Amino acid sequence: MSTVLTSVIGGARVPSGAGRLYRSTDPSRTTDVVAEVSLADADDLVRACEAARNAQDAWRDVPPPVRGQVVAAIGRLVEANKAALARVVTREVGKPYAEALGEVQEIADTCAFFLGEGRRLYGHTVPSEMPDKQLFTFRDPVGVVTAITAGNFPVAVPSWYIVPALLCGNAVVWKPAEYAAACAEAFYQVFAHAGLPDGVLNVVYADGPETFRGLERALVRGLVDKVGFTGSTEVGARIGELCGRHLQSPCLELGGKNPMVVTEDADLTLAVEGALFSGFGTAGQRCTSLGTAIVHESVRDEFVRLLDEATRAATVGDPAGDVLYGPLIDERFADGFEKVLGWIGPRHAVHGSSGTGRISPSNPRDGFDGDAEAGLYYHPVIVDGVRPDDELFLHETFGPIVGVAPYRTLDEAIALANAPGYGLSASIYTTDPAEVFAFRRRISAGMVSVNNSTSGAEAHLPFGGNGRSGNGGRQSGIWVLDQFTRWQSMNWDFSGRLQKAQMDVVEITPDLGFRL
């Protein structure tokens, strides 16, 4: 039995005037409708931004330590509802339950970090070059934040935007992925019961085109001060262009083609463990999923053998069980992955499973656990012999597929790692500190792992990428405060006279001709 979900604007449920319904289904049982969603239109998004604007002034006047108490309450409610939230995530987006629990824990960790920032939204007291004059800096909220998020991390990633934005005194309009609407609804209920005033957090269920049209109108009317977007590079570029017309810099967290370099002296067992987790965890649908393993030619064959062995031994199937990964999130991603599989050519060697493509009774996988016909399950694929001009090498694949490419020198490995033009996450497995720091210095990624996988974020470390992975903005930790606050400087002259900077400064005359 499904529930009809409607947008929440100014604290009130607002069914869409457009009258369109979207059915969010369980990807492990695609006939199971998790929720029916009343899809909003562009006007609804504009109304949500108006409600946020109306609520923001009063919210910004709440002292930051008190706003921190609300964040603390959100964290406690998340902890209390951890299992229930994780079950919704597993059912709606097919994430294995153990991973879903980890995702919910990330929200609690984020709240634990930011509740203290309510007492640490520090400005500075700065000395002046004039007597009887003092200089200050202050952090002020930007105003109204519109956060547009994807469904591969349907509750953790939204918390990266919403929690610090609220803590800093902003009001938020959140547009979650419509195929993860039940997750968004459950998460919104946590915020609503934490004591947030009406209008401070608004939730709009809409598809991409209506969201873009609504955002465009809201920006024209001056109703939005900051846009955060997690999603594809192509859509992120359009949002960046739109915001640029209004002299705004959005926070863009986009795709990744994340490399893992495995050197000749690497611990291959550890490297394979990392490749298995980051390449196939969440069915390869993380922005930080491993794209290409770039392996020294002397150990490449052994690495491929071990990874093939580990992948074949892993259980794929029902996300409620103990599996490496479950189904793809939605039909749209299954369709996209089918296109990716078409990039495999005759010169590639394919490993990892008893077949390729969608798992079914006619295309079975050894050790599969679940109902293959019911869900969007796909074989894991290892493609050995990818080259720098291959589509598989150059593009984000968003599915359970890992490429393998050989290298001879570290210079060549770094060039290969940077070649696709993304810059989110990168990893190196080595025992040589000189290689570690050479790699760190020259890799374009915003995040680097050493002897660890390309996936895995901690709540107090900056998260974000460069190039095709983002515009340099960072989420998480103290660094995200610069996304949701603006610096204001103030000078206070209490001398009783006009003192002109640079012109009325007392000069001390040195004897620069002195020599010993």
Predicted features along the sequence, with ranges:
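ALDH superfamily catalytic-core signature
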Residues: 234-387, 450, 496-500, 506-515
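Residue-level signal for inorganic ion chemistry
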Residues: 31, 67, 89, 111, ...
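Conserved C-terminal structural/oligomerization subdomain of aldehyde/semialdehyde dehydrogenase
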Residues: 32-35, 224, 261, 312-315, ...
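Rossmann-like NAD(P) dinucleotide-binding subdomain of oxidoreductase/dehydrogenase enzymes
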Residues: 123-270, 407
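Glycine-rich loop-to-alpha-helix module at the N-terminal edge of alpha/beta enzyme cores
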Residues: 30-122, 132
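Short, well-ordered beta-strand elements within core beta-sheets of diverse protein domains
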Residues: 34-40, 54-61, 147, 260-263, ...
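Hydrophobic face of amphipathic alpha-helices that form TPR/SEL1-like repeat modules
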Residues: 1-29, 33
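Residues at or immediately preceding the N-termini of alpha-helices
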Residues: 27-28, 42-45, 64, 82, ...
